[in-house]
Amino acid sequence: MFKKFVKKTSVLAFVSACLACSSPAKKEPKIAKLTLEPGFSATVIADSLGAARHIAVSQQGDVYVKLNNLKDGKGIYCLSDTDRDGTIDKTVAFGDYTGTGILVDQKYLYASSNTTVYRYKLDQNQQVTDVDHPEVIVKGLVAHAIDGAKPLVIDKERNLYVAVASYSDACADETKDGKSCPLLDSVAGIWRFDADKLNQEYSDGEQYATGLKGVMGFAWNDVSNSLYALQHGRGNFHEKFPQYFDATYSATYPAETLYELKKGADAGWPYIYYDHIRHKKLLAPEFGGDGKKEGDSKYLEPTLAFPAHLGPNAMLFYTGTMFPEKYRNGAFIAFHNQSPELHKGFCVAFVPFKNGKPTGNWEIFADDFAGIDLKNPTGPSQHKPCGLAQGPDGALYVSDDLQGTIYKITYNAKG
């Protein structure tokens, strides 16, 4: 009896061991090496996607990533965690065009190439119903080889906003009379369309705001019921006007600027730029400036200014409840570059808001995407934050367009 019992026990143990060996091991989320405030943590949910630009997360938690270079012939990747274990276990790729803009609402996924805005219908589970036949919302957008991205925003009234950057840094070559820039009718602004009307032409749009050299990061603020936009500043002061400026000046100015935009707003490019140290709008040298002369006061005053060359590529107003109260309704900003003035950058910043207005200065929220010491670099940056999105649980997602890494940042008060 005893021998039979031992034999049966051994067989059961052997079978159990074999089953354990044949069952796939649970895949643990990869911890991201970012510097965060206490209580926050970050994981890598995807990597090696390539030029991952803007991102959007559906109410079901699916992460949509827009690529600026095709990967396996596709420009949109949908990443799903179907068993909710914190790791991506399903990937669907579609769209044969590159671009930057992407957003998702209850019924549709919107995505842009540099010339066209597309729309995909979603089913009740917020899955794209037909990946091969998107609807065309806007076509014929101005696109050049430089700064051709078309980021997107939709407001509560179903207006679609498309940012169209200037392909000229200061409109110097295009301005023949030394007084007026002829590009402002077609670029350097934000155009408004109907988010539900098909086959609109660029000319059907309304120029909502102008004088914005290049906007990548912008977002609708539901509290103030207004559009906020971040401008990429110009450059090349000392190279074109060495009689007035040196290399240090070019590294320090102009500020990257945040604006609250109402219909008809004019931020002043190319005629002015902003000095964030003296808090003044200065006349651009192409139009008679010398680094001291002030620009016309009629141009919009920035809501907030940041050091030069940080490259604000995305903006998100946080409406979740996962993060502490301090972050509620505040703005997260993805900085895609670095400030020579501060030796900081390649980070996600935060600006506190209350009643739809900034209530304090900006601070770095998530750092060390670069993976190097920016004061004493030993090589190039490893990652560059480019897109931001909020998940249904309140988690913050960040895309990197250098390696194609997607980060998920969460908060747990217990650490």
Describe each region flagged by the PLM.
Residues 26-38, 149, 166-203, 212-214, ...:
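Beta-propeller domain segments
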Residues 43-68, 311-317, 333, 337:
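Beta-strand-rich domains and repeat architectures in extracellular enzymes and scaffolds
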Residues 45-49, 92-97, 137-144, 206-211, ...:
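Surface loop/turn motifs at the tips and blade-to-blade linkers of beta-strand repeat domains
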Residues 57-60, 104-106, 154-157, 219-224, ...:
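Residue-level detector of Asp-centered blade-edge/turn motifs that repeat once per structural unit
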Residues 62-66, 108-111, 159-163, 226-230, ...:
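Conserved beta-propeller blade signature
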Residues 84-90, 124-127:
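Acidic, glycine-anchored loop motifs typical of Ca2+
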Residues 99, 115-155:
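Asp-box/WD-like beta-propeller blade repeats and closely related beta-sheet repeat scaffolds
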Residues 389-415:
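Blade-level signature of beta-propeller repeat domains, shared across WD40, Kelch, NHL, RCC1
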